[in-house]
Amino acid sequence: MIQVLDRQLVDLIAAGEVIDSPLAVVRELVENALDAGADRILVRVWWDQWRLEVLDNGQGMDVTELKTSVLPHATSKISTQADLQRIKTLGFRGEALHSLAQVARLTISSRSVASPGCGWRITYSPQGSPEQIEPVAIAMGTRVEVRQLFANFPQRRQAFAKSQQFWRPMVTYLQQLALCHPQVTWQLWQDERLRLSLSPGPNPEAILLQCLKSLQAGQLGYTQQSLSLPVDLENQATSAQLSLTFGYPDRCHRPRPDWLIIAINGRPVNVPELTQTILAVFHRTLPRQRYPLCFAHWQLPPQCIDWHRHPAKTEIYLQDLPHWQGQLKTLLHQSLAILGNDAPPRLNQLLKAAEPKGVYQLQGASSLTETVLGYPKAFKAIAQVCQTYVVVEHDQGIWLVEQHVAHERVLFEQLQRHWQCLPLEQPLVLQGFNPEQVERLQNLGLEIDPFGEDIWAVRSLPALLQGQEEIIAILRELSQVFSLSTAQAAIACRSAIKNGMELDRIAINKLIEQWQQCDNPHTCPHGRPIYLALDESSLARFFRRNWLVNPKTSGS
């Protein structure tokens, strides 16, 4: 017989969906703290006691707000149906605190700016009504205590019996949220042990350097840009912005896509289409089985986002998704085309080791770890070294460019833009190729016809391959690949200037000019670095010229 469930049971079922893990407790409370304007958030966990605590220095609540804050669907963030289309806060449903009261013992202490002298502490019943109210000495802000978590969900307690099952996701979540809100100080404590501490910084780059201790600033790039709006929003008084923090592919990459993070309006989200856009841009810039480090944070008009897809709001419906994908792709290409002029970290260590202690800094010299973005105003290839490297002088220092991989990158991008197979004057005869190999070559655009038993006539080839001495070996190699991109990379590698080949001044200047115009001048299609950069201050430090007040006016 179908029957209507009583309200208490309905609330308990709903609470189990909203608060499904210890991470959900932290997520809901931390997001409330950010909505309250906090710039210092502390999370404490006593897992043996099934107890959590979140403290913040946000605007706090007075006693009237405290009394109603845990009632079902009590919120200060929306009041009408129209508000659902313009959500600007992290929380808005009014479900989290009420759900917490259902699955744990909940106590909240808070003091607002308007509270005279003291704050208030309230312990709540499972229905969200106050059970005990008392004044308390507390600084402005809020302290939420969660005790006896999941006492009425024994199966859930058993699922989280091991601390490893929640610590890693909790640390990861707070790190990702810190990237979205770099102005906030974060701490995560386990009992009396500090598990995570992040200081505020001017941008996400400063947070990444704290999260990944092996990183150095010279490995990262940061850019922020206003975006064009979709056609349906052009006439509205709104704006969009995208900030990118990324690792240069020749200096920084990961064995897993664990630091490829998408965020929208202050919250990490899962949008597979945007993730794939980033992976596609970084394709053929990294070594095999390596992934980019990239944090992409959008500030979008609220009417573009539907947050009602998942209780945790980690999955969304995003309006005009192809438009935002295109904007992301464009900005990533622009950012990767920029050549950094600072020395890589290992060379920095060498230069710092050679620097005497207590010397004066060069006037106007930047730190070695400061990322210098933008093209030099002028450059000149001045020499070839060991018939392998090209020395390039520019207004900010020098580059040492490996000629083969630089030319390989140039040819690869040319092939991507202009892939075309041209007819041969005389067919090229192939022997020892099976039908599967021939089919793969045909899939690349080559025109090949049967010419006898196990003999094939090649009637067209990519322009770069025509006239190659080892054309049969090259075609045999190409017959093993399954994608056009892989074939283009192989052709570029085979056709590029070889190391050990002497180049005249005209040739090296032409090579450097073509290389600098590449979409990604950092790595070859197989992920090898192309250049080593040394700025003027790096050289001055190595040669101990730091005592000079102004090297441009001194003869020393």
Swiss-Prot record:
Q: What SMART domains does UniProt report for this protein, alphabetically? A: DNA_mis_repair (SM01340), MutL_C (SM00853)
Q: Which UniProt keywords apply?
A: DNA damage, DNA repair
On whether DNA damage is a keyword of this UniProt record, the answer is yes
Q: Does the keyword Cytoplasm apply?
A: no
Q: Got a GO cellular component term for this one? A: mismatch repair complex
Q: Which CDD domains match?
A: HATPase_MutL-MLH-PMS-like, MutL_Trans
Give the coiled coil ranges.
Answer: none
Tell me the GO molecular function terms. Answer: ATP binding; ATP hydrolysis activity; ATP-dependent DNA damage sensor activity; mismatched DNA binding
InterPro entries reported in the protein's UniProt record: DNA_mismatch_repair_CS, DNA_mismatch_repair_MutL, DNA_mismatch_S5_2-like, HATPase_C_sf, MutL/Mlh/PMS, MutL/Mlh/Pms-like, MutL_C, MutL_C_dimsub
**One example of a Gene Ontology biological process annotation:** mismatch repair
Pfam families for this protein: DNA_mis_repair, HATPase_c_3, MutL_C
Q: Which NCBIfam families match?
A: mutl (TIGR00585), PRK00095.2-1 (NF000951)
Q: What does this protein do?
A: This protein is involved in the repair of mismatches in DNA. It is required for dam-dependent methyl-directed DNA mismatch repair. May act as a 'molecular matchmaker', a protein that promotes the formation of a stable complex between two or more DNA-binding proteins in an ATP-dependent manner without itself being part of a final effector complex.
Q: Could you tell me which PANTHER family the record lists for this protein?
A: DNA MISMATCH REPAIR PROTEIN MLH, PMS, MUTL, DNA MISMATCH REPAIR PROTEIN MLH1
UniProt record similarity statement: Belongs to the DNA mismatch repair MutL/HexB family.
Name of the protein: DNA mismatch repair protein MutL
